[in-house]
Design a protein with these regions (language model features):
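Membrane-interface amphipathic segments in extracytoplasmic regions
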Residues: 1-196
Length: 196
């Protein structure tokens, strides 16, 4: 999470949407940068609106706008699958030795096994009540997000390539694709509604 005080802007770091690269590029411009632990770095819109936002707004005497990125849901799960396939991941969270189809099927189960328990972007970006994210951008159109930030921050932004998931095959059988679209209907609906 990054907070830009003078611009009254907060960036929520949706997991697997380039948040590490954004932090590397912009941390020096932010009044507040929370990178650790992950539960704080990846503060949800609900937690922001309930805890962080009210504090910032009381201190500043003005409201803050909230921006975030969202990745296409299947691509987002593919990034998690590849990320957890790398060396050094705890065995119960590792996806080594399984294909993407099995990972997605496991993610669709309730309860999810540890290796597939990565949450959902719709839960991250949708509050239980109250205001949503003010400016939501598609990860596959990150240049629009960068343009928005350049305009708000008044500087050129170049995002480095850091914390990139390894490559891997992310094929799905048609029945698994259909299952994913049913289980992740809220994610697909939110993603499809993004105009930016």
């Amino acid at each position: 999470m990054l907070v830009f005080w003078d611009q009254r802007l907060a960036f929520l770091a949706t997991p697997k949407t380039g948040s590490t690269a954004i932090a590397v590029a912009l941390e020096s411009l932010a009044a507040l940068s929370i990178q650790r632990p992950p539960v704080l770095k990846h503060t949800t819109v609900h937690r922001y609106r309930r805890f962080v936002g009210p504090y910032l707004e009381a201190a500043a005497g003005a409201p803050f706008e909230v921006c975030a990125l969202m990745r296409e849901p299947r691509d987002w799960l593919g990034s998690w699958y590849r990320f957890r396939s790398r060396e050094g991941v705890e065995p119960d969270r590792s996806t080594q030795g399984m294909d993407f189809d099995a990972f997605v099927q496991a993610w669709c189960r309730d309860p999810q096994p540890d290796f597939a328990a990565v949450g959902a972007q719709s839960r991250f970006l949708t509050p239980r009540n109250g205001a949503r994210v003010d400016h939501l951008f598609r990860y596959d159109r990150i240049e629009r997000f960068v343009d928005f930030l350049e305009d708000r921050l008044g500087c050129e932004i170049v995002l480095p390539r850091v914390n990139v998931s390894p490559t891997g095959v992310t094929d799905l059988r048609p029945e698994t694709e259909a299952l994913l679209r049913r289980v992740a209907a809220a994610d697909f609906a939110l993603y499809d509604a993004i105009r930016a």
